[in-house]
Amino acid sequence: ASSDGKRAFWRSGSGRVIVVDLPTYETRVLPGAPADTLFRLSPDSSQLAFVRDHDLWSWDIGAGKAQRLTKDGSDTIKNGTLSWVYWEEVFGRQDIGYWWSPDSKSIAFLRSDESMVTEMTYMDFRPEVPRLIKQRYPKAGTTNPVVLLGIATIGEKGVTWAKTGEEPAEYIVRAKWLPTSDRVSVQTLNRNHDRLDLWFVDRATGEGAHVLT
């Protein structure tokens, strides 16, 4: 359910996403694809964000229209979802890599470029017929994905990229909107894990103000 308690959604067995207005029980069906994933309602329940083919989208529930917020998603570029190393080591096996602003106007998200990460192949023995799985897996000491923090604003084109000192940061380990919605607090970590920096990133410009180390 949305944080304002006005709407909720669920996924049907056929893969459709149904949004329900809790006061009236009126329902709407998201005109999407079964592969759409990682849905999250905006705080004011007016929008439903999701990931489609590694791109971040938002559906205006009232207007019934979807907006594609990123346009470079691919097998090696992930927007709004996490690469394996971030999923496993940084965000505690959480899949979603995006966050609504409190005023529901913008989404901060992670963009992961895995093109330089070695692809590993392993066998999945869980199905009745075993299958091969290919996964971008950075072994210790090898290249990690290049991760950027972007800010997409509903109804506007393009993405504002966060600027936090040397670009790109070796790791972006936390991102959280300030209550005013004008800035995102971002924590960056170096690969040696001995320097953690806190930045406040301006929503409009992407400029990062260094707060502390």
Segments the model singles out, each with a brief description of its role:
Residues 69-99, 106-164:
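Predominantly five- to eight-bladed beta-propeller fold
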Residues 21-25, 61-64, 153-157, 202-206:
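Short loop/turn segments that connect beta-strands within beta-propeller blades
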Residues 30-34, 89, 163-167, 212-213:
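Surface loop/turn motifs at the tips and blade-to-blade linkers of beta-strand repeat domains
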Residues 2, 42-44, 101, 178:
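Structural WD40 beta-propeller signal
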